[in-house]
Swiss-Prot record:
The record marks 95 as: Stabilizes the basic form of H active site to accept a proton. Monomer. TRNA binds at residues 17, 68, 70, 116. It comes from Shewanella oneidensis (strain ATCC 700550 / JCM 31522 / CIP 106686 / LMG 19005 / NCIMB 14063 / MR-1). It catalyses: an N-acyl-L-alpha-aminoacyl-tRNA + H2O = an N-acyl-L-amino acid + a tRNA + H(+). GO terms for cellular component: cytoplasm. This is Peptidyl-tRNA hydrolase. The gene is pth. It is an enzyme of class 3 (hydrolase).
Length: 195
């Protein structure tokens, strides 16, 4: 497996979106930055907040695009092109409707599952889907017509606690990924379910 050189947390910009479910990917990158002791700084060249971190002696770039969700690929493409980072070296963290709050899973490749952020990233990586994802469960409203309002809404306190617990476990698993490998990181994360 390629080493991960870029970790992206998907989000919508602006104070009104900070606590919305769609921003779960950004919560993960913010927590990673915090444990690495680095600050995410706005960089217009990469259309996002970026930082350079070191995890277990390995360099990694952190990125939260500040474009809207459906333009996330603009930021990912700009940073990946500049640093010559291949899709296989990218991990994209995003909210996942098809998993309950309290669960998170790593995955390599696959489609976008209707997620506009992933859709744009795939397009801007020349339709290469072969990047890693960290899927952070937010649950599903049960009706596809309610999805937009659901992802742009705030989770109730109990659900938010479960999502936060899964994000924390994902951060711990990311440390294992950098210290050991993806198989061990997956084994750890995929056995976790916050109650």
């Amino acid at each position: 497996m390629s080493e991960i050189k870029l970790i992206v947390g998907l989000a919508n910009p602006g104070a009104e979106y900070v606590q919305t479910r769609h921003n779960a990917g950004a919560w993960y990158v913010e927590e990673l930055a915090r444990i690495c002791g680095v600050s995410l700084v706005a960089d217009s060249k990469y259309f996002g907040l970026t930082a350079r971190a070191v995890l277990h002696g390995k360099d990694v770039r952190l990125l939260i695009p500040t474009t809207y969700m459906n333009l996330s690929g603009k930021a990912v493409g700009a940073l990946a092109n500049f640093f010559r980072i291949t899709p296989e070296e990218i991990l994209v963290a995003h909210d996942e409707l098809d998993m309950p709050p309290g669960v998170a899973k790593f995955k390599l490749g696959g489609g976008h599952g209707g997620h506009n952020g992933l859709k744009d990233i795939i397009a801007k990586l020349a339709n290469d889907k072969n990047f890693y994802r960290l899927r952070i469960g937010i649950g599903h409203p049960g009706d596809k017509n309610k999805v937009s309002g659901y992802v742009l809404g705030k989770a109730p306190a109990k659900e938010q606690e479960l999502i936060n617990a899964a994000v924390d476990e994902a951060v711990r698993s990311t440390e294992i990924l950098f210290k050991e490998d993806m198989v061990k990181a997956m084994t750890r994360l995929h056995s976790f379910k916050a109650e």
